[in-house]
From Swiss-Prot:
<dbReference type="Pfam" id="PF02109">
    <property type="entry name" value="DAD"/>
</dbReference>
<feature type="topological domain" description="Cytoplasmic">
    <location>
        <begin position="82"/>
        <end position="99"/>
    </location>
</feature>
<comment type="subunit">
    <text>Component of the oligosaccharyltransferase (OST) complex.</text>
</comment>
<keyword id="KW-0472">Membrane</keyword>
<feature type="transmembrane region" description="Helical">
    <location>
        <begin position="61"/>
        <end position="81"/>
    </location>
</feature>
<dbReference type="GO" id="GO:0006487">
    <property type="term" value="P:protein N-linked glycosylation"/>
</dbReference>
<comment type="similarity">
    <text>Belongs to the DAD/OST2 family.</text>
</comment>
<feature type="transmembrane region" description="Helical">
    <location>
        <begin position="37"/>
        <end position="57"/>
    </location>
</feature>
<feature type="topological domain" description="Cytoplasmic">
    <location>
        <begin position="1"/>
        <end position="36"/>
    </location>
</feature>
<keyword id="KW-0812">Transmembrane</keyword>
<comment type="pathway">
    <text>Protein modification; protein glycosylation.</text>
</comment>
<feature type="transmembrane region" description="Helical">
    <location>
        <begin position="100"/>
        <end position="120"/>
    </location>
</feature>
<keyword id="KW-0256">Endoplasmic reticulum</keyword>
<feature type="topological domain" description="Lumenal">
    <location>
        <begin position="58"/>
        <end position="60"/>
    </location>
</feature>
<comment type="function">
    <text>Subunit of the oligosaccharyl transferase (OST) complex that catalyzes the initial transfer of a defined glycan (Glc(3)Man(9)GlcNAc(2) in eukaryotes) from the lipid carrier dolichol-pyrophosphate to an asparagine residue within an Asn-X-Ser/Thr consensus motif in nascent polypeptide chains, the first step in protein N-glycosylation. N-glycosylation occurs cotranslationally and the complex associates with the Sec61 complex at the channel-forming translocon complex that mediates protein translocation across the endoplasmic reticulum (ER). All subunits are required for a maximal enzyme activity.</text>
</comment>
<dbReference type="InterPro" id="IPR003038">
    <property type="entry name" value="DAD/Ost2"/>
</dbReference>
<dbReference type="GO" id="GO:0008250">
    <property type="term" value="C:oligosaccharyltransferase complex"/>
</dbReference>
Length: 120
């Protein structure tokens, strides 16, 4: 009987954690929520590319690597943008949103030039 009580206690703890997460996430600015949606999209694209590689094969291996590097690189750069824009993550350095977004665009341009060059 004690395992049932501890299991229900764990469920209450899990539900309280999930509820707390959604309550705190509802206070997140709209800009960060849009970035989060793009991160989810990029992650799903990377999973699709990797699944395609596993199921179908990697005949044009450079194309697979270019697509996968593009999704991973774009994901990492977007996470960096989210960290820079988030007002909670102010570590004493004040970077304007415009500067962070410009850095993001330039890094994405360099990333995709490298990916395009890698296609051959």
């Amino acid at each position: 009987m004690s395992t049932t009580a501890s299991t229900s206690s764990n469920n209450l703890t899990f539900t309280s954690i999930v509820k707390s997460f959604f309550e705190s996430y509802s206070k997140t600015p709209q800009k960060l929520k849009i970035i989060d949606l793009f991160l989810i999209y990029t992650f799903i694209t990377g999973v699709i590319v990797f699944t395609y590689c596993c199921l179908v094969g990697t005949y044009p291996f450079n194309s697979f690597l270019a697509a996968f590097i593009s999704t991973v690189g774009c994901f990492v750069l977007t996470v960096c943008l989210r960290i820079q824009i988030n007002p909670i993550n102010n570590f004493g350095k004040t970077i304007s949103i415009e500067r962070a977004f410009t850095d993001y665009l330039l890094c994405n341009l360099i990333l995709h030039l490298v990916v395009f060059n890698f296609l051959g």
